[in-house]
Protein backbone atom coordinates (compact mmCIF):
# COMPACT_ATOMS: atom_id res chain seq x y z
CA UNK A 1 0.00 0.00 0.00
CA UNK A 2 1.00 3.58 -0.43
CA UNK A 3 -0.37 6.98 0.44
CA UNK A 4 -1.90 9.00 -2.40
CA UNK A 5 -4.02 12.12 -2.49
CA UNK A 6 -7.22 11.73 -4.48
CA UNK A 7 -7.45 14.69 -6.85
CA UNK A 8 -10.81 13.84 -8.45
CA UNK A 9 -13.71 11.43 -8.10
CA UNK A 10 -16.02 11.13 -11.07
CA UNK A 11 -18.33 8.41 -12.38
CA UNK A 12 -17.11 5.87 -9.84
CA UNK A 13 -13.46 6.47 -10.67
CA UNK A 14 -10.78 8.21 -8.67
CA UNK A 15 -7.74 10.04 -9.91
CA UNK A 16 -4.47 10.81 -8.16
CA UNK A 17 -1.26 12.46 -9.23
CA UNK A 18 1.63 10.01 -9.03
CA UNK A 19 5.21 11.23 -9.28
CA UNK A 20 8.12 9.32 -10.83
CA UNK A 21 9.52 8.42 -7.38
CA UNK A 22 6.25 6.74 -6.40
CA UNK A 23 6.26 4.74 -9.63
CA UNK A 24 9.87 3.74 -8.97
CA UNK A 25 9.40 2.47 -5.40
CA UNK A 26 5.92 0.92 -5.68
CA UNK A 27 4.11 -1.45 -8.02
CA UNK A 28 1.68 1.26 -9.17
CA UNK A 29 3.42 1.42 -12.54
CA UNK A 30 2.31 -2.17 -13.19
CA UNK A 31 -1.40 -1.36 -12.90
CA UNK A 32 -3.60 -1.33 -15.98
CA UNK A 33 -6.39 1.15 -16.64
CA UNK A 34 -9.65 0.01 -15.01
CA UNK A 35 -7.83 -2.56 -12.85
CA UNK A 36 -9.50 -2.71 -9.43
CA UNK A 37 -7.47 -1.56 -6.43
CA UNK A 38 -8.20 -1.35 -2.72
CA UNK A 39 -8.86 2.16 -1.44
CA UNK A 40 -9.04 3.12 2.19
CA UNK A 41 -10.07 6.50 3.49
CA UNK A 42 -7.85 8.23 5.98
CA UNK A 43 -9.04 7.84 9.55
CA UNK A 44 -9.47 10.55 12.10
CA UNK A 45 -6.71 10.68 14.68
CA UNK A 46 -9.11 11.18 17.58
CA UNK A 47 -11.20 8.04 17.12
CA UNK A 48 -10.78 4.42 18.19
CA UNK A 49 -9.42 1.96 15.70
CA UNK A 50 -7.86 -1.50 15.77
CA UNK A 51 -4.15 -1.84 15.24
CA UNK A 52 -1.70 1.01 14.97
CA UNK A 53 -0.73 3.76 12.57
CA UNK A 54 1.19 2.82 9.44
CA UNK A 55 2.31 5.57 7.15
CA UNK A 56 1.78 4.97 3.45
CA UNK A 57 5.20 6.20 2.42
CA UNK A 58 7.14 3.56 0.50
CA UNK A 59 10.90 3.03 0.68
CA UNK A 60 11.16 0.15 -1.78
CA UNK A 61 9.76 -3.04 -3.20
CA UNK A 62 10.28 -6.53 -1.82
CA UNK A 63 9.43 -9.78 -3.53
CA UNK A 64 7.33 -12.46 -1.88
CA UNK A 65 9.27 -15.70 -1.83
CA UNK A 66 8.32 -18.81 0.05
CA UNK A 67 4.92 -19.11 1.72
CA UNK A 68 4.50 -22.04 4.08
CA UNK A 69 1.75 -23.10 6.44
CA UNK A 70 2.27 -23.43 10.18
CA UNK A 71 -1.00 -24.61 11.68
CA UNK A 72 -3.63 -22.06 10.66
CA UNK A 73 -1.05 -19.32 10.11
CA UNK A 74 1.38 -18.76 7.24
CA UNK A 75 5.05 -17.83 7.19
CA UNK A 76 5.86 -15.45 4.35
CA UNK A 77 9.43 -14.88 3.23
CA UNK A 78 10.19 -11.57 1.54
CA UNK A 79 13.35 -10.77 -0.42
CA UNK A 80 14.36 -7.15 0.11
CA UNK A 81 16.97 -4.93 -1.55
CA UNK A 82 20.25 -4.73 0.36
CA UNK A 83 19.76 -0.96 0.55
CA UNK A 84 16.73 -1.48 2.83
CA UNK A 85 18.25 -4.07 5.20
CA UNK A 86 19.35 -1.49 7.76
CA UNK A 87 15.75 -0.32 8.20
CA UNK A 88 14.35 -3.77 9.02
CA UNK A 89 14.35 -4.62 12.72
CA UNK A 90 13.36 -7.95 14.23
CA UNK A 91 10.03 -7.62 16.08
CA UNK A 92 9.55 -4.23 14.43
CA UNK A 93 6.56 -3.34 12.27
CA UNK A 94 6.67 -3.44 8.50
CA UNK A 95 3.80 -2.75 6.09
CA UNK A 96 3.51 -5.30 3.28
CA UNK A 97 0.70 -5.02 0.73
CA UNK A 98 -1.09 -2.61 3.04
CA UNK A 99 -0.93 -4.97 6.02
CA UNK A 100 1.05 -3.95 9.09
CA UNK A 101 3.05 -7.01 10.11
CA UNK A 102 5.65 -7.85 12.74
CA UNK A 103 9.07 -8.85 11.42
CA UNK A 104 9.62 -12.30 12.92
CA UNK A 105 13.01 -13.11 11.39
CA UNK A 106 15.67 -11.10 9.58
CA UNK A 107 18.47 -12.46 7.38
CA UNK A 108 20.66 -10.83 4.72
CA UNK A 109 18.37 -9.47 1.97
CA UNK A 110 15.43 -11.36 3.48
CA UNK A 111 12.80 -11.13 6.18
CA UNK A 112 9.97 -13.33 7.37
CA UNK A 113 6.59 -12.45 8.77
CA UNK A 114 3.78 -14.63 10.04
CA UNK A 115 0.22 -13.93 8.92
CA UNK A 116 -2.69 -15.17 11.01
CA UNK A 117 -5.90 -16.50 9.41
CA UNK A 118 -7.89 -13.32 10.17
CA UNK A 119 -5.40 -11.25 8.17
CA UNK A 120 -4.78 -13.79 5.40
Q: Language-model features: where?
A:
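Conserved loop->alpha-helix
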Residues: 1-120
Amino acid sequence: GCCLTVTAIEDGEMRADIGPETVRVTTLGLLRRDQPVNLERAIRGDGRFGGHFVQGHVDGIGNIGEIREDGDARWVGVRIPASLERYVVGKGSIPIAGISLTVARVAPSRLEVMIIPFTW
